[in-house]
Amino acid sequence: MRKGIHPEYRPVVFRDRAADYAFLTRSTMTSERTVEWEDGRTYPVVDVEVSHVSHPFYTGTARVLDTAGRVERFERRYGKQDGA
């Protein structure tokens, strides 16, 4: 591996703002902001809007929303077909 061309891979805290949850992992992300972690060390912190803690797919709260009856409108327009 060539020296000097790769970003630094280091511990970083990712903070999920929606779920008020933070986790420490390794990444090449950088940040001006820092946070003191449970082990007493200071790490860069990256705020994220969605993580595995708050995403509906991972939490099991996913819902299918039929906004404005689009499925019914489609079926009226093109007819509901039986089959596969």
Curated annotation (Swiss-Prot):
For this protein, the record's Gene3D superfamilies field holds: Ribosomal protein L31
Tell me which UniProt keywords the record has, alphabetically: Ribonucleoprotein, Ribosomal protein
Xref: InterPro entries: Ribosomal_bL28/bL31-like_sf (IPR034704), Ribosomal_bL31 (IPR002150), Ribosomal_bL31_B (IPR027493), Ribosomal_bL31_sf (IPR042105)
Asked whether the keyword Ribosomal protein is assigned, the reply is: yes
Enumerate the GO terms in the molecular function aspect: structural constituent of ribosome
Note the Pfam families from the entry.
Ribosomal_L31
Q: Name one GO biological process term.
A: translation
Which cellular components does GO assign to this protein? ribonucleoprotein complex; ribosome
Q: Which family does it belong to?
A: Belongs to the bacterial ribosomal protein bL31 family. Type B subfamily.
List the HAMAP family: Ribosomal_bL31_2
- Quote the subunit structure annotation: Part of the 50S ribosomal subunit.
> What's the protein called, per UniProt?
Large ribosomal subunit protein bL31B-2
Recorded source organism is Streptomyces coelicolor (strain ATCC BAA-471 / A3(2) / M145)
